[in-house]
Protein backbone atom coordinates (compact mmCIF):
# COMPACT_ATOMS: atom_id res chain seq x y z
CA UNK A 1 0.00 0.00 0.00
CA UNK A 2 1.32 3.45 -0.92
CA UNK A 3 -0.27 5.39 1.94
CA UNK A 4 1.45 4.76 5.30
CA UNK A 5 -0.53 2.62 7.74
CA UNK A 6 -1.09 5.46 10.20
CA UNK A 7 -4.45 6.70 11.44
CA UNK A 8 -4.50 10.26 12.74
CA UNK A 9 -7.08 11.81 15.03
CA UNK A 10 -7.29 15.28 16.57
CA UNK A 11 -8.90 16.43 19.80
CA UNK A 12 -8.50 20.00 21.00
CA UNK A 13 -10.06 21.29 24.22
CA UNK A 14 -11.35 19.35 27.20
CA UNK A 15 -11.95 15.66 27.68
CA UNK A 16 -12.84 13.32 24.86
CA UNK A 17 -16.47 12.14 25.23
CA UNK A 18 -16.88 8.40 25.78
CA UNK A 19 -18.85 8.01 22.55
CA UNK A 20 -15.93 9.40 20.56
CA UNK A 21 -13.46 7.20 22.42
CA UNK A 22 -15.51 4.20 21.38
CA UNK A 23 -15.51 5.34 17.76
CA UNK A 24 -11.74 5.63 17.98
CA UNK A 25 -11.43 2.12 19.43
CA UNK A 26 -13.33 0.74 16.45
CA UNK A 27 -10.46 1.81 14.18
CA UNK A 28 -7.96 -0.01 16.38
CA UNK A 29 -10.12 -3.13 16.34
CA UNK A 30 -9.88 -3.44 12.56
CA UNK A 31 -6.36 -2.06 12.09
CA UNK A 32 -4.35 -3.82 14.79
CA UNK A 33 -1.02 -3.50 12.97
CA UNK A 34 -1.42 0.19 12.13
CA UNK A 35 0.09 3.08 14.02
CA UNK A 36 -2.31 5.48 15.76
CA UNK A 37 -1.58 9.13 16.44
CA UNK A 38 -3.90 11.27 18.53
CA UNK A 39 -2.93 14.93 18.25
CA UNK A 40 -3.83 17.22 21.14
CA UNK A 41 -2.72 20.63 22.34
CA UNK A 42 0.07 18.86 24.24
CA UNK A 43 1.81 17.21 21.30
CA UNK A 44 1.12 19.30 18.19
CA UNK A 45 3.95 19.40 15.64
CA UNK A 46 5.46 22.66 14.47
CA UNK A 47 2.94 24.18 12.07
CA UNK A 48 3.60 26.05 8.84
CA UNK A 49 0.28 27.82 9.30
CA UNK A 50 0.78 28.58 12.99
CA UNK A 51 -0.60 32.11 12.62
CA UNK A 52 -3.85 30.82 11.14
CA UNK A 53 -4.07 28.22 13.91
CA UNK A 54 -3.53 30.85 16.61
CA UNK A 55 -6.15 33.20 15.17
CA UNK A 56 -8.78 30.49 14.65
CA UNK A 57 -11.97 31.04 16.64
CA UNK A 58 -13.18 27.44 16.75
CA UNK A 59 -11.55 24.11 17.45
CA UNK A 60 -12.95 22.94 14.12
CA UNK A 61 -10.89 25.53 12.28
CA UNK A 62 -7.78 24.71 14.31
CA UNK A 63 -8.29 21.04 13.53
CA UNK A 64 -8.61 21.83 9.82
CA UNK A 65 -5.15 23.40 9.96
CA UNK A 66 -3.55 20.56 11.89
CA UNK A 67 -4.92 17.62 9.88
CA UNK A 68 -3.45 18.88 6.62
CA UNK A 69 -0.04 19.46 8.14
CA UNK A 70 0.28 16.09 9.88
CA UNK A 71 -0.73 14.38 6.64
CA UNK A 72 1.88 16.39 4.77
CA UNK A 73 4.60 15.43 7.25
CA UNK A 74 3.73 11.81 8.04
CA UNK A 75 1.22 10.71 5.43
CA UNK A 76 -1.45 8.22 6.47
CA UNK A 77 -5.19 8.46 7.03
CA UNK A 78 -7.01 11.18 8.94
CA UNK A 79 -10.49 10.40 10.32
CA UNK A 80 -12.61 12.77 12.39
CA UNK A 81 -13.21 11.59 15.93
CA UNK A 82 -16.89 11.00 15.09
CA UNK A 83 -16.04 8.43 12.40
CA UNK A 84 -16.46 4.79 13.37
CA UNK A 85 -14.91 1.89 11.53
CA UNK A 86 -16.81 -1.19 10.38
CA UNK A 87 -13.98 -3.11 8.68
CA UNK A 88 -10.40 -2.68 7.53
CA UNK A 89 -10.14 0.06 4.90
CA UNK A 90 -7.10 -1.31 3.05
CA UNK A 91 -9.16 -2.62 0.09
CA UNK A 92 -10.57 0.87 -0.41
CA UNK A 93 -7.28 2.72 -0.60
CA UNK A 94 -4.51 0.19 -1.32
CA UNK A 95 -3.77 1.56 -4.81
CA UNK A 96 -4.22 5.25 -3.98
CA UNK A 97 -1.69 7.89 -3.05
CA UNK A 98 -4.39 10.44 -2.19
CA UNK A 99 -8.06 10.02 -1.30
CA UNK A 100 -10.90 12.00 0.23
CA UNK A 101 -14.50 11.22 1.09
CA UNK A 102 -17.27 12.72 -1.03
CA UNK A 103 -20.41 13.51 0.97
CA UNK A 104 -22.67 14.66 -1.84
CA UNK A 105 -22.70 14.76 -5.60
CA UNK A 106 -22.74 18.56 -5.51
CA UNK A 107 -23.04 21.38 -3.02
CA UNK A 108 -26.56 22.82 -3.17
CA UNK A 109 -28.22 26.05 -2.05
CA UNK A 110 -25.70 27.11 0.58
CA UNK A 111 -23.17 28.96 -1.45
CA UNK A 112 -23.20 30.31 -5.01
CA UNK A 113 -19.61 29.21 -5.65
CA UNK A 114 -20.08 25.56 -4.83
CA UNK A 115 -22.06 23.81 -7.55
CA UNK A 116 -19.26 21.24 -7.44
CA UNK A 117 -18.68 17.82 -5.79
CA UNK A 118 -19.07 18.03 -2.02
CA UNK A 119 -15.74 16.73 -0.68
CA UNK A 120 -15.19 16.45 3.06
CA UNK A 121 -11.89 16.68 4.92
CA UNK A 122 -13.40 14.55 7.72
CA UNK A 123 -11.85 11.47 6.06
CA UNK A 124 -8.76 12.05 3.96
CA UNK A 125 -5.41 10.38 3.38
CA UNK A 126 -2.24 10.55 1.32
CA UNK A 127 1.43 9.75 1.04
CA UNK A 128 3.86 12.14 2.80
CA UNK A 129 4.46 15.39 0.95
CA UNK A 130 1.94 14.54 -1.74
CA UNK A 131 1.52 17.30 -4.29
CA UNK A 132 -2.11 17.89 -3.36
CA UNK A 133 -1.61 17.97 0.39
CA UNK A 134 1.14 20.53 -0.17
CA UNK A 135 -1.28 22.52 -2.33
CA UNK A 136 -3.88 22.48 0.46
CA UNK A 137 -1.40 23.54 3.16
CA UNK A 138 -0.01 26.34 0.99
CA UNK A 139 -3.43 27.60 -0.14
CA UNK A 140 -5.27 27.51 3.18
CA UNK A 141 -4.24 30.90 4.66
CA UNK A 142 -5.18 32.86 1.55
CA UNK A 143 -8.45 31.01 1.05
CA UNK A 144 -9.41 31.44 4.72
CA UNK A 145 -8.74 35.17 4.51
CA UNK A 146 -10.71 35.54 1.29
CA UNK A 147 -13.65 33.66 2.83
CA UNK A 148 -13.34 35.03 6.37
CA UNK A 149 -16.99 36.09 6.50
CA UNK A 150 -18.26 32.59 5.71
CA UNK A 151 -18.89 29.68 8.08
CA UNK A 152 -15.89 27.57 9.12
CA UNK A 153 -17.16 24.74 6.90
CA UNK A 154 -16.60 26.97 3.90
CA UNK A 155 -13.46 28.87 4.88
CA UNK A 156 -11.20 26.02 6.11
CA UNK A 157 -13.22 22.79 5.92
CA UNK A 158 -15.21 20.97 3.23
CA UNK A 159 -15.80 24.11 1.17
CA UNK A 160 -12.08 24.75 0.98
CA UNK A 161 -11.07 21.23 -0.05
CA UNK A 162 -14.00 21.01 -2.49
CA UNK A 163 -12.92 24.17 -4.26
CA UNK A 164 -9.22 23.28 -4.34
CA UNK A 165 -9.64 19.67 -5.50
CA UNK A 166 -12.64 19.99 -7.82
CA UNK A 167 -10.61 19.40 -11.00
CA UNK A 168 -8.14 16.85 -9.63
CA UNK A 169 -8.08 13.18 -10.64
CA UNK A 170 -8.22 11.62 -7.17
CA UNK A 171 -9.89 8.71 -5.41
CA UNK A 172 -13.21 9.96 -4.07
CA UNK A 173 -14.80 7.59 -1.57
CA UNK A 174 -18.54 8.08 -1.91
CA UNK A 175 -19.86 8.35 1.63
CA UNK A 176 -23.29 6.97 0.79
CA UNK A 177 -21.59 3.77 -0.47
CA UNK A 178 -18.95 3.16 2.21
CA UNK A 179 -20.87 4.08 5.37
CA UNK A 180 -22.48 0.64 5.74
CA UNK A 181 -19.40 -1.36 4.73
CA UNK A 182 -16.24 0.40 5.88
CA UNK A 183 -16.61 3.59 7.89
CA UNK A 184 -19.51 5.70 9.11
CA UNK A 185 -19.56 9.43 9.81
CA UNK A 186 -21.87 10.15 12.75
CA UNK A 187 -21.83 13.96 12.30
CA UNK A 188 -21.58 14.73 16.01
CA UNK A 189 -20.59 18.35 15.18
CA UNK A 190 -19.02 18.92 18.59
CA UNK A 191 -18.13 22.49 17.54
CA UNK A 192 -21.60 23.60 16.45
CA UNK A 193 -22.50 25.40 19.70
CA UNK A 194 -19.61 27.80 19.09
CA UNK A 195 -20.37 28.38 15.43
CA UNK A 196 -23.78 26.91 14.49
CA UNK A 197 -24.07 24.69 11.46
CA UNK A 198 -25.35 26.59 8.41
CA UNK A 199 -28.75 25.89 6.92
CA UNK A 200 -29.70 24.63 4.47
CA UNK A 201 -26.94 22.00 4.42
CA UNK A 202 -25.66 20.40 1.18
CA UNK A 203 -27.87 17.59 -0.05
CA UNK A 204 -27.01 14.37 -1.87
PLM regions: where:
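Glycosyltransferase-associated regions of secretory-pathway enzymes
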Residues: 1-64, 79-204
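Small-residue hinge/turn detector
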Residues: 64-76
Amino acid sequence: MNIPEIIHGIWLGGRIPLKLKNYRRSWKRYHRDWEFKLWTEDNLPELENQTLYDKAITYAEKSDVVRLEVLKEFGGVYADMDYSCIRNITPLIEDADFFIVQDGKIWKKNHPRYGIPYLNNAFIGCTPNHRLIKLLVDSLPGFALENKDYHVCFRTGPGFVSQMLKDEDILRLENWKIRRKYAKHHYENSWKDIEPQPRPWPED
